[in-house]
Each structure stands twice: as structure tokens, then as C-alpha cells.
């Protein structure tokens, strides 16, 4: 088993910034891999080994039974990930504003992206979060949990579901959610939201199977579009 723990700090003394942005580049292949990364400060990057200073590409993790723990504490941080794994456990924490989370998990069906357990915690505003799970595979038994506290955040999730569960809890104004779940087996999406001026678009399109959706939202000036389609007539939002 491989385990790596990385901690970075950006320090301030007498009001002057002494250290430039931190960048972590990762390319890992093999099973049973654990990685912990913590970055404290602003403008930090986590991505791939072919990145160059100031320009980040997606990190590359290939294998099965992997655990990834990412903590970025500060503003304007960026995490880009290209993960190919079965039995993948991911914990992603972002505390700050204007952060970017851009991850795809097994998009080409190398391992199938089964039995993943993902938790995404966001505290802050103007963050851009994107997760693509098993676009050409089946996210069997996926357990996905989001906790978002802040305003003007954008969350995009695209999942090829197979008995997957997706729980999202949002507290804040002017947030946007775009969720697309398709595949050949049913999935469950539960969204709890508290805030104003929200825009929520949900598409559930399991081919000839059942999908479940529960939305509880409290606030003013909301726009909702819900599409459920099990291979019937094509529909779209106005």
C-alpha cells in the first residue's frame, strides 16, 4: 500500500507575502493508493505531472481501491483530476472563494467506476465545481454527498448512474445546480436548498428504469427545470 501526505503553507509576515503559489503535480498508477494533500493559502494548484508553472493540467490517478483526501483552504485555488478507479474514496474540502474543482472519474470505462464514495464540502462564494462520474461506464453503488455553504456557487454533476445515490445540501443565495444522471439502472437524487435566486436544472434519464428525485427548497426567486425520461419522447427546458 502506498500512502502520501503533503502539507503546504503560505505564510504572511509584516503584511508581505513571502511565498508564491504552491503547485502539486501527480501521476500515479497502481492499486491500493492513499493520498492526502493540504494546501493553506491562496492561488494553490493541484494537477498533473505534465503541467508547467502557472498552467495546470489534470492529475492522473489509475488503479483500484484508492483514497484521495484534498483540503484547499484559501481563495482562488484550483484542483483538476482525471481518476480511473474502482472502489475509490474521495474527500474534497474547499474553504474560500473563487475556487475551481474539476474532476472526471473513469470516463472511458477502464475499471467501471463502481463502489465510489465521494464527499465534497464547500464553504465560500463564487466557486465553480464540476464532477463527471463514469461517462462511458456505470457508477454502480456510487455514494455522493455535497455540502455547500455560500453564495454564487455553480455545481455541475454528470453521472452515468447504476443504483447511485446523490445527496446535495446547499445554504446560500444565487447558487446554480446542473445535474444530469443517465444510464441503464435507477438513481436517487435528494437536494435540500435554503436561499434566494437559485437556478436548479435536473435531468434523470435512466433507460427503461426508475429514477427518484426529492427537492426541498426554501427561498425567493427560484427557477427550476426537472426532466425525467426513461427513453421516451425527448424533452427539454424552455
Language model regions located:
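Sec-dependent N-terminal signal peptides
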Residues: 4-13
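Low-complexity repeat regions of mature extracellularly deployed or surface/particle-associated proteins
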Residues: 20-238
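Sec/Tat signal peptide C-region and signal peptidase I cleavage site
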Residues: 13-21
Amino acid at each position: 500500500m502506498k500512502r502520501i501526505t503533503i502539507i503546504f503553507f503560505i505564510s504572511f509576515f509584516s503584511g508581505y507575502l513571502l511565498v508564491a503559489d504552491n503547485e502539486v503535480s501527480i501521476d500515479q498508477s497502481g492499486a491500493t493508493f492513499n493520498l492526502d494533500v493540504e494546501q493553506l493559502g491562496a492561488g494553490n494548484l493541484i494537477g498533473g505531472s505534465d503541467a508547467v508553472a502557472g498552467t495546470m493540467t489534470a492529475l492522473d490517478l489509475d488503479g483500484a481501491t484508492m483514497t484521495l483526501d484534498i483540503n484547499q483552504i484559501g481563495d482562488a485555488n484550483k484542483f483538476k483530476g482525471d481518476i480511473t478507479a474502482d472502489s475509490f474514496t474521495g474527500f474534497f474540502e474547499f474553504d474560500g472563494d473563487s475556487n475551481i474543482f474539476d474532476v472526471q472519474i473513469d470516463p472511458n470505462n477502464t475499471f467501471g467506476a463502481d463502489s465510489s464514495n465521494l464527499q465534497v464540502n464547500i464553504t465560500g462564494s463564487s466557486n465553480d465545481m464540476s464532477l463527471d462520474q463514469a461517462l462511458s461506464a456505470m457508477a454502480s453503488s456510487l455514494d455522493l454527498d455535497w455540502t455547500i455553504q455560500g453564495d454564487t456557487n455553480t455545481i455541475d454533476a454528470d453521472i452515468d448512474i447504476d443504483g447511485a445515490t446523490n445527496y446535495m445540501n446547499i445554504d446560500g443565495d444565487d447558487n446554480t445546480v446542473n445535474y444530469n444522471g443517465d444510464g441503464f439502472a435507477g438513481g436517487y437524487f435528494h437536494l435540500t436548498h435554503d436561499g434566494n435566486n437559485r437556478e436548479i436544472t435536473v435531468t434523470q434519464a435512466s433507460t427503461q428504469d426508475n429514477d427518484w428525485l426529492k427537492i426541498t427548497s426554501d427561498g425567493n426567486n427560484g427557477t427550476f427545470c426537472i426532466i425525467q425520461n426513461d427513453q421516451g419522447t425527448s424533452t427539454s427546458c424552455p
